């Protein structure tokens, strides 16, 4: 067991502090140490020297304490602030707020020094709880004497107060008295004892006399007897010696360097001298100035040029990209419209082929039909004809309403409407006033004539002061085919005659190979009148019409309509057809 304890103690480090009293090391001791002569070394003896060090050993030395100056003054070769005998030094009172710790007779810290800071010693400062207790209730009441003072103390205090008041009053009165009036105050008389001496051999005894010496009375109104003269100022202290180099003769270079040109003004020449330009430039001092241009200007200009070039390149690339996107979008739109047109032509051709196999209804709507032919029609054909007439009336009414709205629109609204509807023929553009014909040579002017003085004001073309005709679009409107509103012809002969006249006119041959026609136009059915646009039907396969026919045949006549529900185009078809026939 002991071997284990010894091994454990050996493994532990040596403790720094123990509970026993031990000697502190030399560096931890404070204060003077008493050593024997054997422990003292010559290298440890340091003698304190007063006064400045000898010459040659003053490198880095600065006088700080009064002992450093010795019995002399400041050292001029040391360029620091020096105060021998503290002459010229400002008050050494510290500006710090730190206070020295003070204790009372009992060894307690006197914290009232904080409250007394900045006050005089005779000022009463209450800084403890004891000062708040009345004198009669204090514990040390017996130590304070409250007896009446004696007569001697009262007289001494009264005399002291009287003298203090008299000094204050006399000072105030003396300040009000004039200072330059004579005889204002007379000195007290002086008494002198006079004993006469022996004169002329007289040896008799002489009596002493008491003489009173009084200051002579002065007239306060007497003018001054002497005139005050100002004493001239004495000679000043001799000037300090100035060390000059020995005189030497000036060389030609020195004379040229010291040659100062006379002042030459650029605005005044009262004497009228003729000063050459080189002398003016020499007097101006421009040759002495070194003009230098900073390189930053060139760098800044180059940076601006590079930034501008990059910006223009970015704008160009952006514009090209936008143009490509617009062209691509336009091509897609044209392709879509072309596909729709092709689809419409194919549907129209199929409808034409189906209509050719079915019995023809005829194109004429004349009133010469007989009652026998009308009676021979089946009810289904009459209803179909009435439905077709109702559709045509509805389209005409919509066209009339659209034309009325367009006539009330402004030019900007017309342009916006045309932008929304790009796929319109030239007749509608002419109706809107957007198709401008090419001006003839008579209405075109040379722009160079407008810059000359000879013009309308000098009698040129006085009869026609307008550069454009008033109705520029009227010629284009008259030259473009516009079908008449009443497109219904009386008979087939009139329709065939109108068609033959249009075919013989050959109006559009100037535009190209018009006889061959356009691609897909041969499959389209013949058209009489203006181009009629077809709307997308909600029922392309005819399912709704088939259901309507079935429901109409079963009990459609007995259906009841509510509110503003429109009547079915199939209902009362026979009556509408009969009315149209009567008309």
Curated annotation (Swiss-Prot):
InterPro entries: SKI-int_prot_SKIP, SKI-int_prot_SKIP_SNW-dom. The keyword Nucleus applies. Pfam families: SKIP_SNW. It comes from the Eukaryota. Residues 203-225, 325-350, 386-424, 519-538, 569-583 have a biased composition (Basic and acidic residues). One of its GO terms (molecular function) is RNA binding. It is found in: Nucleus. Keywords: mRNA processing, mRNA splicing, Nucleus, Spliceosome. Its main location: nucleus. The keyword Nucleus applies. One of its GO terms (cellular component) is post-mRNA release spliceosomal complex. Residues 367-377 have a biased composition (Low complexity). Residues 233-244 have a biased composition (Pro residues). Coiled coil: none annotated. Residues 1-68, 177-253, 321-424, 519-583 are annotated as: Disordered. One of its GO terms (biological process) is mRNA splicing, via spliceosome. Associated with the spliceosome. Involved in pre-mRNA splicing. Belongs to the SNW family. PANTHER family: NUCLEAR PROTEIN SKIP-RELATED. This is Pre-mRNA-processing protein 45. It comes from Emericella nidulans (strain FGSC A4 / ATCC 38163 / CBS 112.46 / NRRL 194 / M139) (Aspergillus nidulans).
């Amino acid at each position: 067991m002991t071997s284990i304890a010894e091994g454990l103690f050996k493994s532990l480090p040596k403790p720094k502090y123990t509970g026993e009293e031990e000697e502190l090391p030399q560096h931890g001791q404070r204060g003077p140490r008493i050593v024997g002569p054997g422990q003292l070394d010559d290298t440890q003896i340091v003698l304190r020297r007063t006064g400045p060090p000898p010459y040659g050993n003053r490198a880095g030395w600065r006088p700080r304490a009064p002992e450093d100056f010795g019995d002399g003054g400041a050292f001029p070769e040391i360029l620091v602030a020096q105060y021998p005998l503290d002459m010229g030094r400002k008050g050494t009172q510290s500006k710090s707020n730190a206070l020295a710790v003070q204790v009372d007779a009992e060894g307690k810290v006197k914290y009232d020094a904080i409250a007394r800071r900045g006050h005089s010693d005779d000022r009463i400062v209450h800084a403890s709880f004891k000062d708040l207790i009345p004198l009669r209730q204090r514990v040390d009441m017996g130590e304070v004497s409250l007896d009446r003072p004696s007569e001697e103390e009262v007289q001494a205090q009264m005399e002291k107060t009287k003298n203090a008041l008299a000094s204050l009053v006399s000072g105030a009165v003396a300040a009000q008295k004039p200072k330059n009036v004579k005889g204002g105050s007379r000195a007290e008389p002086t008494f002198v004892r006079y004993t006469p001496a022996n004169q002329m051999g007289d040896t008799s005894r002489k009596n002493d006399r008491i003489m009173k010496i009084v200051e002579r009375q002065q007239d306060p109104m007497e003018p001054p007897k002497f005139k005050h003269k100002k004493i001239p100022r004495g000679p000043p202290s001799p000037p300090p010696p100035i060390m000059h180099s020995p005189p030497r003769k000036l060389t030609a270079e020195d004379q040229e360097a010291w040659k100062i040109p006379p002042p030459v003004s650029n605005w005044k020449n009262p004497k009228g001298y003729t000063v050459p330009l080189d002398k003016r430039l020499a007097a101006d001092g421009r040759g002495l100035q070194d003009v230098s241009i900073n390189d930053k200007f060139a760098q800044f200009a180059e940076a601006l040029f590079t930034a501008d070039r990059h910006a223009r390149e970015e704008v160009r690339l952006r514009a090209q990209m936008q143009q490509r996107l617009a062209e691509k979008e336009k091509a897609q739109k044209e392709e879509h419209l072309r596909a729709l047109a092709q689809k419409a032509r194919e549907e129209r051709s199929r409808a034409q082929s189906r209509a050719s196999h079915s019995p023809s209804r005829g194109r004429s709507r004349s009133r010469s039909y007989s009652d026998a032919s009308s009676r021979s029609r089946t009810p289904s054909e009459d209803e179909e004809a009435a439905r077709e007439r109702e559709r045509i009336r509805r389209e005409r009414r919509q066209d009339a309403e659209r034309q009325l709205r367009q006539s009330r629109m402004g030019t900007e609204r017309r342009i916006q409407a045309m932008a929304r509807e790009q796929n319109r023929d030239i007749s509608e553009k002419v109706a809107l006033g957007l198709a401008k014909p090419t001006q003839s040579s008579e209405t075109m002017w040379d722009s160079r004539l407008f810059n000359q003085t000879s013009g309308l004001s000098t009698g040129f073309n006085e009869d026609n002061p307008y550069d454009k005709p008033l109705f520029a679009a009227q010629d284009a409107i008259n030259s473009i085919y516009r079908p008449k509103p009443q497109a219904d012809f009386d008979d087939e002969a009139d329709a065939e005659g109108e068609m033959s006249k249009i075919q013989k006119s050959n109006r559009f041959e100037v535009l190209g190979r018009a006889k061959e026609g356009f691609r897909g136009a041969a499959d389209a059915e013949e058209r009489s009148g203006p181009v009629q646009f077809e709307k997308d039907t909600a029922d392309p396969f005819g399912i709704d019409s088939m259901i309507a026919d079935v429901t109409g045949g079963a009990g459609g006549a007995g259906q009841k309509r509510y509110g503003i529900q429109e009547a079915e185009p199939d209902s009362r078809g026979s009556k509408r057809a009969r009315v149209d026939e009567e008309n």
